[in-house]
């Protein structure tokens, strides 16, 4: 497994631009409705240029596995889960970004910008940076349902 860290805001801006161009094309062509029927709630934001994919995060880390790895999907998620916990402990905000994985799948430009070695595929994406908002307390969790 390898990690690709996007730490420069200029590079994140490149990812955003390519992704927004792709999203705009999909919105105009109505293809987005086929891939993601519940997209209606994001359409206005996409049309207004709001960053619905990367959430204005300044940084991103992509975990990639060799295409022939035995646990190619699970291992990256486990690794980034540890990083997620560590970053949260340092008061750095995180956001899992499954939409970016789809964007990488559909866009050769994004894959080229990602610059993964041949034979590797992005399997998990974690956005991170200092949070734009602060909460006085955590949200109350729902009761856990236990089945006997």
Residue ranges of model-derived segments:
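Acidic, surface-exposed loops and disordered segments
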Residues: 1-148
């Amino acid at each position: 497994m390898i990690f690709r860290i996007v730490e420069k805001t200029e590079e994140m801006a490149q990812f955003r631009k390519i992704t927004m161009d792709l999203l705009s094309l999909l919105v105009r062509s109505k293809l987005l409705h086929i891939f993601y029927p519940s997209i209606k709630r994001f359409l206005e934001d996409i049309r207004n240029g709001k960053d619905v994919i990367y959430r204005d995060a300044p940084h991103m880390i992509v975990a990639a596995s060799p295409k022939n790895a035995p646990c190619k999907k699970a291992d990256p998620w486990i690794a980034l889960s540890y990083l997620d916990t560590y970053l949260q402990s340092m008061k750095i905000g995180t956001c899992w970004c499954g939409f970016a994985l789809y964007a990488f799948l559909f866009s050769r430009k994004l894959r080229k910008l990602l610059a993964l070695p041949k034979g590797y595929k992005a399997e998990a994406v974690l956005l991170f940076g200092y949070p734009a908002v602060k909460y006085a307390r955590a949200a109350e969790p729902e009761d856990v349902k236990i089945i006997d």
